[in-house]
Amino acid sequence: MVKFHLLVLIAFTCYTCSDATLWNPYKKLMRGSASPRRPGESGEPLFLTPLLQDGKIEEARNKARVNHPMLSSVESYSGFMTVDAKHNSNLFFWYVPAKNNREQAPILVWLQGGPGASSLFGMFEENGPFHIHRNKSVKQREYSWHQNHHMIYIDNPVGTGFSFTDSDEGYSTNEEHVGENLMKFIQQFFVLFPNLLKHPFYISGESYGGKFVPAFGYAIHNSQSQPKINLQGLAIGDGYTDPLNQLNYGEYLYELGLIDLNGRKKFDEDTAAAIACAERKDMKCANRLIQGLFDGLDGQESYFKKVTGFSSYYNFIKGDEESKQDSVLMEFLSNPEVRKGIHVGELPFHDSDGHNKVAEMLSEDTLDTVAPWVSKLLSHYRVLFYNGQLDIICAYPMTVDFLMKMPFDGDSEYKRANREIYRVDGEIAGYKKRAGRLQEVLIRNAGHMVPRDQPKWAFDMITSFTHKNYL
């Protein structure tokens, strides 16, 4: 999800001599403001941590129940968990219990990318129970992942979406801190819903979530806290996980026919220079080079747009049609009755439009890798990497590039493994490969946001992974 105003990815940072201009990947997908339209009518935000600390668990659950006519057809809960009292840092969440087999269904956390993209994009645009039509009506999604999962959508890191902090020191500057905050959140979540503690626990996300998901998994794996979380696996879609091994854009775009040899030379030179900058820890230099290729510098047209004609790099078939899908989500979230119903009051919604503080604070993290964490996690848990065939910014070949270079239990098996056809109800949904605890999947006719482009196949894929171990 990159160039996605609610969804995903690299969020490279471009610096001028006087200020920081942040690449805003979701800008084209989420337009407008989610500020309350009628101040004073949105109720108060619900902070659950004080209630939990006082042992008022049932009261907290009752207060967290989402109460809005357009959302009442599906049981759900929302509110804030404080993860850093010193800086008043709070994570907003929206929990949707499983529709079927509630007593045994696995838990599935969803983390959007960005960084700075709200997971409410994933909830309303990709895999949640609700979809908002252009006429502002709310419809139920046919292939909602809550049908057989307890879904938890978290605005992560602090400062994303409705999540907030009162201090610059409350923002995350690295993935360790992201994981720590998510760990503090989930510990409180299980106090609020203790009946879920023994359920199989999975973490999923896309784009820059390719870092957040392993960060959360690694924090759980290393935690000595009791009771233990029943972590079973991780699922990463079009993930930005090992950046320096996922920058081979020149070859990829050339093979697609989107650039010629001159364009390939420019991409190869600039990505090589970015890698050199990153290796000497000059992230400002590295980010600026990638920014120039994909989003433009100092108000100038990006090189990608100059040579391809496209601004969006989510789907090379749809091109800029992808960016013209006008989302009404922002307007929906500005409705005072909605805000009151989901317990956010008049708190601002940080949507990555304009100054993206989350991305700014994580600018030194942009090109860092979490591959060593993935490698360690693969020794204990199942990990699914899936990609849309038509994605550019987190393309399938680049995911394979980093997986082929990553040492893990089963790496030699992965290099030898044959790919199989993945079918859903007789249709060719894509291709799959398995080695050790690693599952790799390519979904046909999908771009950066696989669940949105191919909802039926994505639903089958995630269900097979969480319920049958492998596809």
Swiss-Prot record:
Main location: secreted
Localization in the cell: Secreted
Signal peptide: 1-19
UniProt keyword terms in alphabetical order: Carboxypeptidase, Glycoprotein, Hydrolase, Protease, Secreted, Signal
Superkingdom field: Eukaryota
Induction summary: By 20-hydroxyecdysone.
Keyword Transcription regulation among UniProt keywords: no
E.C. number: 3.4.16.-
Protein name, UniProt field: Vitellogenic carboxypeptidase
Organism, scientific name: Aedes aegypti (Yellowfever mosquito)
Lineage per the UniProt record: Eukaryota, Metazoa, Ecdysozoa, Arthropoda, Hexapoda
